[in-house]
From Swiss-Prot:
Tissue-specific expression: In brain, expressed in the hippocampal CA1 region, the lower layer of cerebral cortex, the anterior olfactory nuclei, the anterior ventrolateral thalamus, the lateral region of hypothalamus, substantia nigra, tegmental area and central nucleus of the inferior colliculus, the ventral supramamillary nucleus and the cerebellum. Expressed in brown adipocytes: expression predominates in mature brown adipocytes (at protein level).
Family designation: Belongs to the G-protein coupled receptor 2 family.
CDD domains named among the record's database cross-references: 7tmB1_secretin
Protein name as catalogued: Secretin receptor
Pfam families: 7tm_2, HRM
Region of interest (Disordered), residue spans: 423-447
Modifications the protein undergoes after translation, according to the UniProt entry: Phosphorylated on Ser and Thr residues at the cytoplasmic C-terminus by G protein-coupled receptor kinases (GRKs).
Organism whose genome encodes this protein: Mus musculus
Role description: G protein-coupled receptor activated by secretin (SCT), which is involved in different processes such as regulation of the pH of the duodenal content, food intake and water homeostasis. Ligand binding causes a conformation change that triggers signaling via guanine nucleotide-binding proteins (G proteins) and activates cAMP-dependent pathway. Upon binding to secretin, regulates the pH of the duodenum by (1) inhibiting the secretion of gastric acid from the parietal cells of the stomach and (2) stimulating the production of bicarbonate (NaHCO(3)) from the ductal cells of the pancreas.
Amino acid sequence: MLSTMSPRLSLLLLWLLLLINAAHPVGALPRLCDVRRVLLEERAECLRELSEEKKALGPKTASGCERFWDNMSCWPSSALAQTVEVPCPKFLRMFSGRNGSLFRNCTKDGWSETFPRPDLACGVNMNGSFNERRHAYLLKLKVMYTVGYSSSLAMLLVALSILCSFRRLHCTRNYIHMHLFVSFILRALSNFIKDAVLFPADDVTYCDAHRAGCKLVMIFFQYCIMANYAWLLVEGLYLHTLLAISFFSERKCLQAFVLFGWGSPAIFVALWAVTRHFLEDFGCWDINSNASIWWVIRGPVILSIVINFIFFINILRILMRKLRTQETRGNETHHYKRLAKSTLLLIPLFGIHYIVFAFSPEGAMEVQLFFELALGSFQGLVVAVLYCFLNGELEVQKKWRQWHLQEFPLRPVALSNSFSNATNGPTHSTKAGTSEQSRSIPGANVI
């Protein structure tokens, strides 16, 4: 007896899952057209195999249960009194990312009902109240990261313009900062472009007219994300090198850093795109149901986070040792305050907060989304403020220009080294020239 529950259940699952999908901000759930296409492809493949089996049998009648399509899965032919196992339907794995199995018995009356229930076996939540709460949560999250990326984008553009405009600020350290700013800008822009492509008003546009363009957008998005992590790692590597190595060529290192920061992400993203094309080519490539393929990108990102965290710990150890040699015993409170300030300055520059959820379980996904999207979207804003707008030398330059224009409106503005040397802002001095060889570090003025 064929199951009469399967078609209704499949439609119910689709309806409930698509309610969640309508508000998902990061493109982790498929569109209805993607699900429909997967179902049609699997149905066509199942019917083709059934036709070939019938041709092979000829006029003979097969005993047992023949292959059939139940609107969710393709069940292979089976002998009587056998239990057949098939994996969870592909469209359910697209939503849940969970691998499971469904079973049917071949009886003298035909196929039995499916067991266990597909929603339970395949990890699909059928709780309507939970879905509504998640829907509202994801909407709020989307608003938060849109505000975060917008504010970060505006501040980063201004900060980048400032660093590019002042020739006195052109040094290896600030060149690295500028590349980091550009990576944050690209990350924000790629998020806006991705949302515009993945969530248009018309599903047909998404599914048919711009399928190739949509995949290119996702390739660009993944590249921008990886490039941002790469430049966070470059910041950590550069500062660690300043403290750990006495002499090295900063100019040659800058060339290597640029090649690594922009080149290494391209290699991994290209490998991911080729793998997706041949092994998981459905939808807009915004769904990562195959964990093995996703690790082509996730693996290097987690590795960069771990390496940067190791740099962070070692840098703090070196700073603590240096401070202990400089401080007197009676000034322990001041010593710890300066170390705390240095630590807080390094956290956004290195992206240390990412280590919290680098190895998070699936159950912590919503909390991880909050930290990485809602709070992480403001990281560019924080970095721009700390390493540009609160920069000590920039503060003096602005005040000096204002005073000079008021007192001598017809004379050109010239900044002497005495003003630069007198700076004592909340972050490190960014003066170029011989000061680079002094191995000053971010936050040196507050240590």
